Amino acid sequence: MSIAVASASIPEPVRYEPLRVMVVDDSVVIRGLISRWIEAEPDMVVAASLRTGLDAVNQVERVKPDVALLDIEMPELDGISALPQLLAKQRNLIIIMASTLTRRNAEISFKALSLGAADYIPKPESTREASAAEIFRHDLLQKVRSLGARVRRKVQTGPGAVAAPAIVRAREPAPVPAAGHAPAVPLLRRALSLTAPRVLLIGSSTGGPQALMTLVADIGAVIDRFPVLITQHMPPTFTTILAEHLARASRRPAHEGIDGEIIKPGQIYLAPGGKHMRVARQGGNTVIALDDGPAVNFCKPAVDPLFISAIEVWQSAIMAVVLTGMGSDGMRGGKDVVAAGGSVIAQDEASSVVWGMPGAAANAGICAAILPLNQIGQKLVRVFAGDRS
């Protein structure tokens, strides 16, 4: 008598359509460079290459991109004017603003974030310098991939499959003469440190500016009694503007850290773009120590140097917070903070723009709490007031 044994079928791995990226920039050189980088990646494709914001607004419904790289300065319709029109036509479009490092463009980039842009990326002054071009390429592809993960489409197969929209290229003008939800699997939580914290450290990246402004507005009672040190992945000029926004949001003094500056309660210190911010003991004082060394975790400033250096000064009396951001910066430093007896809190997945940095900390099992952004401030106020629950 033979017995038929049914073999268990192994499900095919989920496959996704390449991310469709719309590149909008009036420079044919920049468009060409970005397009070549994107086309070289297996998980993304250039859906449209366009010269003006007006072209983008007119074609977005037909092109159906997942991500738009939108230059700020363009003829006919600039990026900040095109932004709300694009989102009105495609609500879930991920828009990354691109601009050169000027104060005006930094201000516009912050305005764009408040209008619905997902992120920004600084363009190098010249793409002829190999190192600058490579940093731009790395950051751009990482942002497209991380932010685009929220809208990736599964591959459709079978008779009902719908063809992807056509690829659109810019028509060059004639030359002018002379001119989340939170994770389903529970994550390990650690007990809060028994040591009362004497400093608040915060690390953030993508989505960080908006998250930081929300958080500092909620923790005035903490800022008044303790120093707050922040590292946000951000270039020079942009950090200057961010410090001004943090001062307005918190109604407390906030500025970029200055090398050798004595750290005092009642102040918010922000790592300046292009330099790591550490802390050190100098005589009887605790001071800011700026570091112009190499990037850490592909970032400068990076969160880990701040977290790790703080242990030498405050030992177990540290409260570290990891907010939204891509990558894993802050996880290693957070581990060291916890090993020294301090505490770490991470933003939850549902309220994060990208759950990379806080997710890395959460999955490492080092967090005393994993909370929505709007609950972190309340938790910090209680902890700094003596609550250890």
Swiss-Prot record:
A Pfam short name: Response_reg
Q: What's noted about domains in the record?
A: Contains a C-terminal catalytic domain, and an N-terminal region which modulates catalytic activity.
Q: Which GO terms describe its molecular function?
A: phosphorelay response regulator activity; protein-glutamate methylesterase activity; protein-glutamine glutaminase activity
**Positions bearing 4-aspartylphosphate:** D71
Q: What class of enzyme is it?
A: hydrolase
Q: Where is the CheB-type methylesterase domain?
A: 193-387
Q: What does this protein do?
A: Involved in chemotaxis. Part of a chemotaxis signal transduction system that modulates chemotaxis in response to various stimuli. Catalyzes the demethylation of specific methylglutamate residues introduced into the chemoreceptors (methyl-accepting chemotaxis proteins or MCP) by CheR. Also mediates the irreversible deamidation of specific glutamine residues to glutamic acid.
What does it catalyze? [protein]-L-glutamate 5-O-methyl ester + H2O = L-glutamyl-[protein] + methanol + H(+); L-glutaminyl-[protein] + H2O = L-glutamyl-[protein] + NH4(+)
The active site annotation covers S205, H233, D329
Which taxonomic lineage is given here?
Bacteria, Pseudomonadati, Pseudomonadota, Alphaproteobacteria, Hyphomicrobiales
Report the record's Gene Ontology biological process terms: chemotaxis
Q: CDD domains in the record, alphabetically?
A: CheB_Rec, REC_CheB-like
Q: Which SUPFAM superfamilies match?
A: CheY-like (SSF52172), Methylesterase CheB, C-terminal domain (SSF52738)
PROSITE patterns annotated for this entry? CHEB (PS50122), RESPONSE_REGULATORY (PS50110)
Q: Name one GO cellular component term.
A: cytoplasm
Q: Where is the signal peptide?
A: none
Location(s), subcellular: Cytoplasm
Q: What is its EC number?
A: 3.1.1.61, 3.5.1.44
Q: How is it modified after translation?
A: Phosphorylated by CheA. Phosphorylation of the N-terminal regulatory domain activates the methylesterase activity.
Alphabetized, the UniProt keywords read: Chemotaxis, Cytoplasm, Hydrolase, Phosphoprotein
Q: What is this protein called?
A: Protein-glutamate methylesterase/protein-glutamine glutaminase 1
Which superkingdom is the protein from? Bacteria
The Response regulatory domain covers 20-138
Which organism was this protein described from? Rhodopseudomonas palustris (strain BisB18)
- rRNA-binding among keywords: no
Q: According to its UniProt record, which protein family does this protein belong to?
A: Belongs to the CheB family.
